[in-house]
């Protein structure tokens, strides 16, 4: 089986061939943790979670290194902390926890590594120093360090923009200390009135903080090396963020290609406009959680449109996804005695024409709409079958395919939620939040807190099962 993926660098769909035939390295730009994620942010996470699942199918999860960073130092973070009158550390720590809770609600796997920018300042300083030494960057008297764009001849290779068009759209041309209007910042000096120690770091150019672009170059290099297979992110990151990443990384490591495949997902729109906090047209993941909407339905809504196309959020698209999830769950429930063991499901995949068609769709540039159509066809065939053995085999195929899409992470939600309401002191939403906090506690190696949360839920009749992919499922103990 071969995966074909659209490479923004070549503007073509290409057969994916990793640097190492037995392993894959993937870097995805993660959240800037100044506020809770809206569903436009979440769509990107779900897209690369699906890619991670497909790569795991092909190469084995143990052979995938999936790095997704946390940007925990940024102008937006500094301004938000001042607005709330709290420390930067408190803001970023609490927002990171909420991000993990929201992604758990959507059934997303944990990345292999999730580095924070502030933990890797030394790597950034080393790369900036190297760029200055090679003449690719320069420092100014006021403590700024800029990358000299004209020193990298392939600067526009990814974005395919012209410098003339960049001049017309430039926001930074008013900075007189820059040698060229397109030069971008690698290091910013600390503001004289900035008293938050979390925003100030020592450097050879004085106290300050890194620019946004250098953060991802440093973390991808530290955890994946000079060359890696896939770099992912939203289409809005093609320019300037990913364009600048390529420039500084390839100049810092002249023999490297940086990332081989550049993958970008489309915007999530509202009435044709990109969803963003600046336009105040956003819906947060928590807004949907508060409506007690199944996270699997939200995830399915994202996957119902091809990842490279814009997705317009509206009530109809969400209701359609909710109806499909209910249809799939009802289909599974209609088959008595279905074996849900993973081994049986995998064995069924090997010889099942329906699952072969489903997998083929995902291998064709993550064609999730076609994969969902295959899924519904399997469900339709289950309802038509009279023989219990045929129903069982098809249901195993349905379970396998649904698990690969990530829409069965809370299969028990509908049935168990009614039991929870009747027999427990916690709601399904509260259970999901506690599970996310427990996952965070385990990542922080706070084993006592993790055990306390498990015991708390158990005392309320909720049993937890930790899965190999880092997610946790729950069910009501009858």
From Swiss-Prot:
Motif range ('HIGH' region): 31-41
Binding positions for ATP per the UniProt entry: 277
Major enzyme class: ligase
Motif 'KMSKS' region: positions: 274-278
GO biological process, one term: cysteinyl-tRNA aminoacylation
Top-level taxonomic group: Bacteria
Catalytic activity field: tRNA(Cys) + L-cysteine + ATP = L-cysteinyl-tRNA(Cys) + AMP + diphosphate
Any one GO molecular-function label of the UniProt entry: cysteine-tRNA ligase activity
Pfam families (alphabetical): DALR_2, tRNA-synt_1e
Subcellular location(s) per record: Cytoplasm
Binding-site list for Zn(2+): 29, 216, 241, 245
Oligomeric form and interacting partners: Monomer.
Record-linked PANTHER family: CYSTEINE--TRNA LIGASE, CYTOPLASMIC, CYSTEINYL-TRNA SYNTHETASE
Name of the protein in question: Cysteine--tRNA ligase
Native species: Orientia tsutsugamushi (strain Ikeda)
Phylogenetic placement of the source organism: Bacteria, Pseudomonadati, Pseudomonadota, Alphaproteobacteria, Rickettsiales
């Amino acid at each position: 089986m071969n995966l074909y993926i659209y490479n923004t660098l070549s503007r073509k769909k290409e057969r994916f061939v990793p640097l190492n035939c037995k392993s894959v390295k993937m870097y995805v730009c993660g959240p800037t943790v100044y506020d809770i994620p809206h569903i436009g942010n979440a769509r990107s996470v779900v897209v690369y979670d699906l890619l991670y699942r497909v790569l795991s199918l092909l190469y084995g999860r143990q052979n995938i290194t999936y790095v997704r960073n946390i940007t925990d130092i940024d102008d937006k973070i500094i301004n938000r902390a001042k607005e709330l009158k709290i420390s930067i550390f408190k803001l970023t720590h609490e927002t990171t926890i909420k991000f993990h809770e929201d992604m758990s609600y959507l059934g997303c796997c944990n990345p292999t590594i999730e580095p924070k920018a502030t933990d890797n300042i030394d790597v950034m300083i080393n790369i900036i120093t190297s760029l200055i030494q090679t003449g690719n960057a320069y420092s100014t008297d006021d403590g700024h360090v800029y990358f000299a764009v004209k020193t990298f001849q392939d600067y526009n290779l990814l974005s395919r923009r012209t410098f003339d068009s960049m001049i017309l759209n430039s926001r930074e041309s008013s900075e007189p200390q820059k040698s060229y209007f397109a030069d971008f910042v690698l290091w910013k000096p600390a503001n004289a009135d900035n008293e938050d120690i979390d925003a100030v770091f020592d450097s050879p150019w004085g106290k300050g903080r890194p620019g946004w672009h250098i953060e991802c170059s440093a973390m991808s290099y530290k955890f994946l090396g000079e060359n890696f297979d896939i770099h992912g992110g939203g289409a809005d990151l093609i320019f300037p963020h990913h364009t600048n990443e390529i420039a500084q990384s390839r100049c810092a490591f002249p023999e490297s290609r940086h990332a081989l495949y550049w993958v970008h997902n489309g915007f999530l729109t509202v009435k044709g406009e990109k969803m963003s906090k600046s336009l105040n047209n956003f819906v947060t993941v928590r807004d949907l959680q508060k409506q007690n909407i199944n996270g699997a339905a939200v995830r399915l809504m994202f996957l119902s449109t091809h990842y490279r196309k814009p997705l317009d959020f509206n009530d109809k698209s969400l209701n359609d996804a909710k109806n499909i999830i209910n249809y799939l769950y009802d289909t599974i429930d209609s088959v008595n005695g279905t074996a849900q063991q993973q081994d049986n499901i995998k064995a069924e995949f090997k010889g099942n024409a329906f699952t072969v068609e489903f997998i083929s769709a995902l291998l064709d540039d993550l064609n999730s709409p076609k994969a969902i159509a295959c899924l519904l066809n399997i469900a339709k065939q289950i309802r038509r079958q009279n023989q219990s053995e045929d129903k069982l085999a098809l249901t195993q195929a349905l379970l396998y395919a649904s698990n690969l899409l990530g829409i069965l992470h809370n299969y028990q939600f509908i049935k168990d939620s009614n039991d929870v309401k009747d027999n427990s002191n916690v709601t399904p939403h509260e259970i999901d939040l506690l599970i996310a906090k427990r996952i965070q506690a385990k990542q922080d190696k706070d084993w006592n807190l993790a055990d306390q949360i498990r015991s708390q839920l158990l005392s309320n009749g909720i049993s937890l099962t930790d899965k190999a992919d880092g997610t946790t499922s729950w069910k009501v103990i009858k």
